[in-house]
Curated annotation (Swiss-Prot):
Species of the source: Sorangium cellulosum (strain So ce56)
Keywords per UniProt: Ribonucleoprotein, Ribosomal protein
Database matches in PANTHER family: 30S RIBOSOMAL PROTEIN S16, SMALL RIBOSOMAL SUBUNIT PROTEIN BS16M
Stored Pfam families: Ribosomal_S16
Family: Belongs to the bacterial ribosomal protein bS16 family.
GO cellular component: cytoplasm; small ribosomal subunit
Name the UniProt record assigns to this protein: Small ribosomal subunit protein bS16
NCBIfam families: S16 (TIGR00002)
GO biological process, one term: translation
Record-level Gene Ontology MF annotations: structural constituent of ribosome
InterPro entries: Ribosomal_bS16, Ribosomal_bS16_dom_sf
Length: 88
């Protein structure tokens, strides 16, 4: 089972709000997830993360998506790099 750290959209029409979640890569964007690691509000550029849990999942092989990797660099998680296939 390949596990990704990705954004799950929430909120209403024209007011997006995202949850940063750990999910199986085959599950839909707003579908089931394993664990919620934080939130991202693009309207206020506010990011809230459970940093120890993010590090735990990355050390266990979870791959962050390109967008999440960019968000993880913001609070200073140097270990979180963009996945290799995102350099297209």
């Amino acid at each position: 089972m390949a596990v990704h750290i990705r954004l799950a959209r929430a909120g209403t029409k024209k007011t997006p709000f995202y949850r940063i979640v750990v999910a199986d890569q085959r599950s839909p964007r707003g579908g089931r997830f394993i664990e919620r690691l934080g939130t991202y509000d693009p309207r206020r550029t506010e990011i809230r993360l459970d940093v120890p849990r993010v590090r735990h999942w990355i050390s266990n092989g979870a791959q962050p998506t390109h967008t999440v990797a960019l968000l993880l660099k913001h609070p200073g998680l140097a270990q979180a790099a963009a996945p290799a296939d995102a350099a297209k």
